[in-house]
Amino acid sequence: MAGNKGRGRAAYTFNIEAVGFSKGEKLPDVVLKPPPLFPDTDYKPVPLKTGEGEEYMLALKQELRETMKRMPYFIETPEERQDIERYSKRYMKVYKEEWIPDWRRLPREMMPRNKCKKAGPKPKKAKDAGKGTPLTNTEDVLKKMEELEKRGDGEKSDEENEEKEGSKEKSKEGDDDDDDDAAEQEEYDEEEQEEENDYINSYFEDGDDFGADSDDNMDEATY
């Protein structure tokens, strides 16, 4: 091609001398030795103290950490539920204890409250009944009940009498209506019979031309 110099050789895109060696020189050998050690530090860490006191404090710290994790108010990150549940997780024991707070040591604002329904207004009937004089003695109560029963029986008897009178009046009106209907029906039947008799008695005398205008009795045609 016209852009390339020569055939079969590619031109370098950078200066080789800038890398540190000239043309024809060999590349440096690969170093297979470990790197040099980290230089010595001026400030070294303090050595750990050993003894019974230190071991006791370490054990106490671990126990405190475990007890804090077992408390019910310790927030744990929720585990992602896998599609396939492991058999071992099904029977794992939960070591958390149920925390029953002592509300004497905590403020009242933190205590949860259950919503209670407010009692509605009392019915008016109960108030009206309470306004009357209370009947304390049993004798007064019995007398009051007897009076009410007598009043109820009297009212019932009056109502029954009124119903009987109303039924009698209705029966009388019904009989009158039936009589009127029967009379009208008889008059209607008499009128029908008269009309039928008139049709039967409609005859012609001798010598009258019966059906003169009709075409059926004509022997010859008239022009």
Swiss-Prot record:
BP term (GO), one: transcription by RNA polymerase III
Quaternary structure, from the entry: Component of the RNA polymerase III complex consisting of 17 subunits: a ten-subunit horseshoe-shaped catalytic core composed of POLR3A/RPC1, POLR3B/RPC2, POLR1C/RPAC1, POLR1D/RPAC2, POLR3K/RPC10, POLR2E/RPABC1, POLR2F/RPABC2, POLR2H/RPABC3, POLR2K/RPABC4 and POLR2L/RPABC5; a mobile stalk composed of two subunits POLR3H/RPC8 and CRCP/RPC9, protruding from the core and functioning primarily in transcription initiation; and additional subunits homologous to general transcription factors of the RNA polymerase II machinery, POLR3C/RPC3-POLR3F/RPC6-POLR3G/RPC7 heterotrimer required for transcription initiation and POLR3D/RPC4-POLR3E/RPC5 heterodimer involved in both transcription initiation and termination.
Induction (UniProt): Induced by NANOG and POU5F1/OCT4. Negatively regulated by the interaction of microRNA MIR1305 with 3 miRNA responsive elements (miREs) in its 3'-UTR. Transcriptionally regulated by MYC. down-regulated upon cell differentiation.
Basic residues composition-biased segments: 114-125
Residue numbers of Phosphoserine PTMs: S157
Function field: DNA-dependent RNA polymerase catalyzes the transcription of DNA into RNA using the four ribonucleoside triphosphates as substrates. Specific peripheric component of RNA polymerase III (Pol III) which synthesizes small non-coding RNAs including 5S rRNA, snRNAs, tRNAs and miRNAs from at least 500 distinct genomic loci. Acts as a long tether that bridges POLR3C/RPC3-POLR3F/RPC6-POLR3G/RPC7 heterotrimer and the mobile stalk of Pol III, coordinating the dynamics of Pol III stalk and clamp modules during the transition from apo to elongation state.
Protein's cellular compartments: Nucleus; Cytoplasm
Protein family: Belongs to the eukaryotic RPC7 RNA polymerase subunit family.
GO molecular function, one term: chromatin binding
Biased composition (Acidic residues): 174-198, 205-223
Modification Phosphothreonine occurs at: T133
Name of protein: DNA-directed RNA polymerase III subunit RPC7
UniProt region (Disordered), positions on chain: 110-223
Name of the gene: POLR3G
Composition skew (Basic and acidic residues), residue ranges: 140-155, 164-173
One GO term describing the cellular component: nucleus
Tissue: Barely detectable in differentiated tissues. Expressed in embryonic stem cells and in other dividing cells, such as some tumor cell lines.
